[in-house]
């Protein structure tokens, strides 16, 4: 993953084979330095248990001065869930939750595979919504707010690059859906 601060320019060269470039941006102040964070330099965490075990690679967090961004990748096992228990980061209640928009870019192996994502708000939310999306290889979902769990179809590994943007820039400052938080203790 490459971080390019506001006001900077970089040139990317493909050495060989295919290349896929995903660009995510947020308003930020100029400053800091461009950084290349290699896969083996990302913070690796195995999260969850049972059928909601996944591997999370955090490339951009407190390791570099990245203005308003936090970014990484989540690898779901075939048939596995992630962002579980469902969580959100859309209200200002530091240090436990800070508002951050998020975007997911999905990759599925094998390419004909798919998964599902639900994005929803808490009951009683005055501007509430509840949306379910079939996600396939190359799809992008913007998450301006709400809880947002993901599941991979059996037989297909589902990975997604995620980028968070917000003033708080605190990884882990989210709230679990209280209706589903019990799975952490089960």
Predicted segment positions?
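Conserved metal-binding segment of the jelly-roll/cupin
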Residues: 1-15, 26, 134-155
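Hydrophobic alpha-helical segments and helix pairs
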Residues: 1-52
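Active-site region of the double-stranded beta-helix
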Residues: 27, 41-137, 152-186
């Amino acid at each position: 993953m490459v971080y390019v601060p506001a006001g900077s320019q970089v040139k990317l060269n493909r050495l060989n084979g295919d290349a896929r470039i995903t660009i995510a941006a947020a308003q930020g102040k100029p400053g800091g330095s461009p950084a290349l964070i290699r896969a083996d330099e990302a913070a690796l965490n195995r999260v969850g248990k049972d059928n909601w075990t996944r591997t999370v690679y955090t490339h951009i967090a407190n390791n570099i001065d990245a203005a308003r961004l936090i970014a990484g990748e989540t690898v779901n096992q075939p048939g596995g869930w992630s962002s579980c228990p469902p969580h959100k980061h859309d209200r200002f209640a530091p240090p436990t939750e800070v508002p951050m928009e998020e975007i997911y870019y999905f990759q599925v192996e094998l390419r004909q595979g798919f998964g599902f994502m639900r994005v929803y708000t808490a009951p009683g939310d005055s501007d509430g919504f509840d949306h379910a999306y079939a996600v396939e290889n190359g799809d992008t979902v913007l998450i301006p707010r709400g809880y947002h769990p993901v599941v991979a179809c059996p037989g297909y590994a589902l990975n997604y690059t995620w980028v968070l943007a917000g003033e708080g820039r605190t990884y882990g400052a989210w709230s679990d859906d209280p209706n589903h938080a019990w799975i952490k203790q089960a």
